[in-house]
C-alpha cells in the first residue's frame, strides 16, 4: 500500500525547541531504487496571554453601573485578530472576537449582573490561538449594587411649614 509509520518517543518530541523542522523519510527497494520525501513541521508550544482591563473604573460595580450593564475588555498576546476570547462571569459565558489591535470586548447585560447579586467574584477569560494553544487570565471584581437606605421624617410635625415655623430654625431629621 505504500503507507508507513514510525513512533517518535515523547522525550524526543519534548526536547524540540520552538522552530520549524524538516521531517525526511527515505526508502530503497530491492532493485536499489530510492526515493526521499520531506515535510516541514512547526513546533509552537507558546501559550497566548489574556489580560482583563479594570471593570467599572474601580473593579466595583455599583447599583447605577449594574443597572446599565457593563463592558468587559482586555488584550491578548500570542493570538491573532479573529481568534475568539471566551469570558465567564457569574456562571455565564460570553464571547468576543480579537480585533486587529489585539483587543477584545464583551457587553454584559444589566439583567445578568443583577442576577449574580452582590459579592466578590472573578472574571475569567481564555483565548485559543491558531495552533490550538490556550491561555487564560482573570480579574477579581465586586458587585455592590445595594442602594443606601435613607428616609426623611415628617417635617414640622405635619409636613407644613406654617407662619410661626417659617420664622424659626427648622430641624429636619431622618
For each feature predicted by the language model, list its residue ranges.
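Short proline/glycine-enriched turn/loop motifs at strand-loop junctions of beta-rich domains
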Residues: 76-83
Amino acid at each position: 500500500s505504500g503507507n508507513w509509520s514510525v513512533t517518535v518517543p515523547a522525550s524526543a518530541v519534548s526536547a524540540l525547541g520552538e522552530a520549524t523542522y524538516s521531517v525526511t523519510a527515505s526508502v530503497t527497494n530491492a532493485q536499489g531504487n530510492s526515493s526521499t520525501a520531506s515535510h516541514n513541521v512547526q513546533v509552537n508550544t507558546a501559550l497566548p496571554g489574556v489580560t482583563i482591563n479594570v471593570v467599572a473604573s474601580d473593579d466595583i460595580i455599583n447599583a447605577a453601573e449594574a443597572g446599565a450593564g457593563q463592558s468587559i475588555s482586555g488584550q491578548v498576546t500570542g493570538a491573532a485578530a479573529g481568534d475568539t476570547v471566551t469570558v465567564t462571569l457569574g456562571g455565564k459565558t460570553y464571547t468576543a472576537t480579537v480585533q486587529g489591535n489585539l483587543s477584545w470586548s464583551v457587553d454584559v447585560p444589566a439583567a445578568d449582573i443583577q442576577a449574580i447579586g452582590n459579592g466578590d467574584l472573578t472574571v475569567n477569560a481564555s483565548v485559543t490561538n491558531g495552533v490550538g494553544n490556550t491561555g487564560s487570565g482573570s480579574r477579581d471584581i465586586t458587585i455592590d449594587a445595594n442602594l443606601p437606605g435613607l428616609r426623611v421624617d415628617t417635617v414640622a410635625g405635619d409636613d407644613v411649614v406654617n407662619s410661626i415655623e417659617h420664622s424659626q430654625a427648622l430641624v429636619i431629621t431622618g
